[in-house]
């Protein structure tokens, strides 16, 4: 089981892509969060306390530069490989200059299927989460997302990798 510890570090508005289900970012930041998910049942399952919107990450209806932060918390594995670059580009479009874009996810060579167990600590609460991909042939790794971010007016700030999981944070360029 992989452990993720989250603390409140952001001020301002947060767009959480794939924020249904356990609603981890929404639990942490509450009303600061607008969580989108393309599955109604995931949004219905998420706890209350933050805005939830049914929306596709590749075609967001938000105005450009609408959010101070954009997060993907174990979401990319659920976005088809051929749509991930578009989702990142849309996230960057919605991000204000100087804002941060963050990805937490798992690296895996091949889904046959792939399942990972997480112990997520949100303040003093522990939330056990299972994430899995059943699409045969699916794979992802840190390097792929670093390459995808190229050309998106982002400067890499943090890159951490441990136990088959990774965390990336970029800041959107101001000019």
Summary of predicted features, one role per range:
Residues 1-11:
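Conserved alpha-helix/loop element of class I SAM-dependent methyltransferases that forms part
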Residues 15-59:
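Class I SAM-dependent methyltransferase SAM/SAH-binding core
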Residues 58-70:
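A short acidic, Gly/Pro-enriched loop at the edge of an enzyme's catalytic core
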Residues 69-83:
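A short SAM/SAH-binding and catalytic strip from SAM-dependent methyltransferases
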Residues 85-97:
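A short glycine-rich, Lys/Arg-flanked "PGG" loop and its adjoining helix->strand segment in the class I
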Residues 104-159:
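C-terminal alpha-helical "lid/dimerization" subdomain adjacent to the S-adenosyl-L-methionine
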Residues 150-175:
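Core SAM-dependent methyltransferase catalytic element
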């Amino acid at each position: 089981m992989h452990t993720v510890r989250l603390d409140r570090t952001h001020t301002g508005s947060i767009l959480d892509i794939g924020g249904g289900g356990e609603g981890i970012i929404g639990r942490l930041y509450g009303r600061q969060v607008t969580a989108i998910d393309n599955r109604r049942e995931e949004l219905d399952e998420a706890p209350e306390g933050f805005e939830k919107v049914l929306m596709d990450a590749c075609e967001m209806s938000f105005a450009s530069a609408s959010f101070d932060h954009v997060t993907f918390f174990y979401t990319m594995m659920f976005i088809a490989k051929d749509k991930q670059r578009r989702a990142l580009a849309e996230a960057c479009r919605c991000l204000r200059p100087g804002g941060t874009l963050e990805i937490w996810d798992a690296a895996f060579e091949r889904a046959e299927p792939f399942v990972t167990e997480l112990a997520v600590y949100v303040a003093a609460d522990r939330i056990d989460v299972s994430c899995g991909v059943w699409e045969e042939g699916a794979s992802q790794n840190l390097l792929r997302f670093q390459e995808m971010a190229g050309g998106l007016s982002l400067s890499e700030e943090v890159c951490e990798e441990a136990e088959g999981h990774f965390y990336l944070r970029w800041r959107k360029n101001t000019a």
